[in-house]
């Protein structure tokens, strides 16, 4: 959520920056609402002052032995007018807030301006894609060869865009998540967390999924009206519960940065992706991810973004997977991000790079929604923290990359050296 003072005082500057994202801010409407708010605010304050004054007059008139009934009726009428004015003001403030909740974050000044993914800018590459001297199999074919990926069983159990993993493929999937967690906790300074996979609406508002992206979530509801009326949603990413751990908190600045990680399943409806990536593990309704979240001082957030992206890169480097680093243009960034790096891993069967990690600096956009603040020891003043989140990595897509990049001519899959300790020394699947 943007700073309301910025929206009130510099709407044209805000509109210009949002236009870089392809978002049109209705400045005239905001100005009209703000002018109306000022009028209602003054009217409410005047009515309150008048009512207070008349209420005091009742006591004074009573002390003089005068008839107070006319004054009492006047105070009652003022009270009714005040209640109506407050209700109108609150309704208008709610309308302004609802609009503010739909406005994306401002892009950082160094983010390239563009319309969509075609305007993203490549920053660097690591590793060289392997040259195969045999026909490359995709991960679905490899998974079926080793009886490790069963999409038909998942359709029977649930539906499309789900999978049942079995045997050594399932074991490698688990090994990848353990390897990532160990790397981030033992070498990168993150604390491991286990979080709920169901969250309430306040939590989803805090990180920006609601109200704008309700259609992207899987929501729960009671089977009967008389049942528990709690309304939860499955998490689309561990960013949601991890970041909300600091909601409504005031943190000593000396305790920053806070670096958290968690391995969770993620659930997404994939609304709008009909017909895309229908084969395999690339785009699923349920997938595992190891998430990184940092809570930092405002002046340190851009450095933290570089650090966090490096942590995700380290996973790929230790696995020996070629990748490229992309800075997203203004039109391709997520709703809450001010700057985002994507890491794209080489997928041999597709002969292209595919996203495997996205690391974003959100500035104070989420912190303002969550009222997450830090306090300075020197002057005891509080200010909003900055939050960052990143994939470290998407486990299913990493499995795809390992299976395809490490495949052998006979269909076996070599186990990367860093994963062998998690697989009892196994060198090959198959």
UniProtKB/Swiss-Prot annotation:
Subcellular location: Cytoplasm
Keywords: Aminoacyl-tRNA synthetase, ATP-binding, Cytoplasm, Ligase, Nucleotide-binding, Protein biosynthesis
Binding site for L-serine: 237-239, 291, 391
Entries under InterPro entries matching the protein: aa-tRNA-synt_IIb, aa-tRNA-synth_II, aa-tRNA-synth_II/BPL/LPL, Ser-tRNA-ligase_type_1, Ser-tRNA-synth_1_N, SerRS_1_N_sf, SerRS_core, tRNA-bd_arm
GO molecular function, one term: serine-tRNA ligase activity
SUPFAM superfamilies: Class II aaRS and biotin synthetases (SSF55681), tRNA-binding arm (SSF46589)
One biological process term in Gene Ontology: seryl-tRNA aminoacylation
Catalytic activity: tRNA(Ser) + L-serine + ATP = L-seryl-tRNA(Ser) + AMP + diphosphate + H(+); tRNA(Sec) + L-serine + ATP = L-seryl-tRNA(Sec) + AMP + diphosphate + H(+)
Pathway stated in the Swiss-Prot or TrEMBL entry: Aminoacyl-tRNA biosynthesis; selenocysteinyl-tRNA(Sec) biosynthesis; L-seryl-tRNA(Sec) from L-serine and tRNA(Sec): step 1/1
Residues reported to bind ATP: 268-270, 355-358
UniProt EC number: 6.1.1.11
Gene3D superfamilies listed in its UniProt record: Bira Bifunctional Protein, Domain 2, Serine-tRNA synthetase, tRNA binding domain
Family to which this protein belongs: Belongs to the class-II aminoacyl-tRNA synthetase family. Type-1 seryl-tRNA synthetase subfamily.
Database matches in CDD domains: SerRS_core
Name of the molecule in the record: Serine--tRNA ligase
Gene, per the UniProt record: serS
Recorded domain comment: Consists of two distinct domains, a catalytic core and a N-terminal extension that is involved in tRNA binding.
């Amino acid at each position: 959520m943007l700073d309301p003072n910025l929206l009130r005082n510099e709407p044209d500057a805000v509109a210009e920056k949002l236009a870089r994202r392809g978002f049109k801010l209705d400045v005239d409407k905001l100005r009209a609402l703000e002018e109306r708010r000022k009028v209602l605010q003054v009217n409410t304050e005047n009515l309150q002052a008048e009512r207070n004054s008349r209420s005091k007059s009742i006591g004074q008139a009573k002390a003089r032995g005068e008839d107070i009934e006319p004054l009492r009726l006047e105070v009652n009428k003022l009270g009714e007018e005040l209640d109506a004015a407050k209700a109108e003001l609150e309704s208008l403030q709610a309308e302004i807030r609802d609009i503010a909740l739909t406005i994306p974050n401002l892009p950082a000044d160094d983010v390239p301006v563009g319309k969509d993914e075609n305007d993203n800018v490549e920053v660097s590459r690591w590793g060289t894609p392997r040259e195969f001297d045999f026909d490359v199999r995709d991960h679905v074919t490899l998974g079926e060869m080793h009886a490790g990926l069963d999409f038909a069983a998942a359709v029977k159990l649930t539906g499309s865009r789900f999978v049942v993993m079995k045997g050594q493929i399932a074991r490698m999937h688990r090994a990848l998540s353990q390897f990532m967690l160990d790397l981030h906790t033992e070498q990168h300074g993150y604390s491991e967390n286990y979080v709920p996979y169901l969250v309430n609406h306040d939590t989803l508002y805090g990180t920006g999924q609601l109200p704008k992206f309700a259609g992207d979530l899987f929501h729960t509801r009671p089977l009967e009206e008389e049942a528990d009326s709690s309304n939860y949603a499955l998490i689309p990413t561990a960013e949601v519960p991890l970041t909300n751990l600091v909601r409504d908190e005031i943190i000593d600045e000396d305790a920053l940065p806070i670096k958290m990680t968690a391995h969770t399943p993620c659930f997404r409806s994939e609304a709008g992706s009909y017909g895309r990536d229908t084969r395999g593990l690339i785009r699923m309704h349920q997938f595992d991810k190891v998430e990184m979240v940092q809570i930092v001082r405002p002046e340190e957030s851009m450095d933290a973004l570089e650090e966090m992206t490096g942590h995700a890169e380290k996973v790929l480097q230790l696995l020996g997977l070629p990748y490229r680093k992309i800075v997203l243009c203004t039109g391709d960034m997520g709703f809450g991000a001010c700057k985002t790096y994507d890491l794209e891993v080489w997928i041999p069967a597709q002969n292209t790079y595919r996203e495997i990690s996205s690391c974003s600096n959100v500035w104070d956009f989420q912190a303002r929604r969550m009222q997450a603040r830090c306090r300075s020891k020197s002057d005891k003043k509080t200010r909003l923290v900055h939050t960052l989140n990143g994939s470290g990595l998407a486990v299913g897509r990493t499995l795809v990359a390992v299976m395809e990049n490490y495949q052998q001519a006979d269909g076996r899959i070599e186990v990367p050296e860093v994963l062998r300790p998690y697989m009892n020394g196994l060198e090959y699947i198959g």
